[in-house]
């Protein structure tokens, strides 16, 4: 959200059309094409709010919390000096984080293969109907001004299949939907003025909708 609106418009074209336009020329982006972005929800000075159309094109929006005590200790350990990297104009202290981009964890072929495996994960008709029900509930809830678009359902199915594969399954289960609903849905909905005035939060409203759906059964 620190990018200017013109830059955000260019990114929207890349995310939606998988291409970029420079002047009168248009260039197709290589595949697979992924966008990972960070946003500071607290510091708003010098930022530009992302339009709903652009937020909707992010499959997931994961909200980070403060690290635990053990995690923070590990961060400090990894950030300790690992020597000095000499450059033409001097030198800088190196940390383990500086070496992340030098440690490849997979290849282009590995990513394509994983994408193919995700598409083979089975989604039952019952699961699909529950996804549609949840998305529709966001459009009918009295506290929500802007409900989720059909892209939310598409993203929830994709994310559920990926989660199933990560957990060693070739089919989705209800736990996938409940585990991913917040990351897939929250950034796509907007509470109305009355709900905000009452101090309600999107996560609370979403939990109400999930609780009201009852048990999800059937994986075949």
Segments the model singles out, each with a brief description of its role:
Residues 132, 137-220:
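C-terminal engagement/docking regions of AAA+ P-loop ATPases
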Residues 108-115, 128-130, 134-140:
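Short conserved motifs of the RecA-like P-loop NTPase core
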């Amino acid at each position: 959200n620190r990018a200017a609106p013109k830059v955000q418009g260019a990114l929207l074209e890349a995310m939606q059309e998988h291409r970029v336009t420079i002047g009168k020329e248009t260039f197709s982006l290589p595949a697979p094409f992924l966008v990972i972005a960070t946003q500071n929800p607290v510091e708003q000075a010098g930022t530009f709010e992302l339009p709903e159309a652009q937020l909707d094109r992010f499959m997931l929006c994961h909200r980070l919390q403060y690290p635990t005590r053990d995690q923070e200790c590990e961060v400090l350990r990894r950030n300790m000096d690992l020597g000095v990297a000499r450059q033409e104009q001097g030198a800088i202290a190196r940390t383990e984080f500086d070496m992340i981009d030098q440690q490849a964890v997979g290849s282009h072929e590995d990513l394509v293969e994983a994408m193919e495996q995700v598409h083979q994960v089975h989604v039952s008709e019952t699961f699909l109907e529950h996804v549609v029900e949840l998305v529709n509930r966001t459009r009918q809830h009295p506290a929500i001004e802007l409900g989720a678009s059909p892209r939310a359902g598409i993203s929830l199915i994709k994310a559920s299949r990926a989660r199933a594969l990560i957990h060693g399954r070739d089919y989705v289960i209800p736990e996938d939907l409940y585990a991913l609903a917040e990351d897939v849905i929250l950034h796509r909905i907007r509470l109305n003025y009355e709900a905000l005035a009452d101090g309600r939060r999107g996560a609370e409203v979403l939990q109400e909708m999930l609780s009201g759906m009852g048990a999800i059964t059937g994986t075949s």
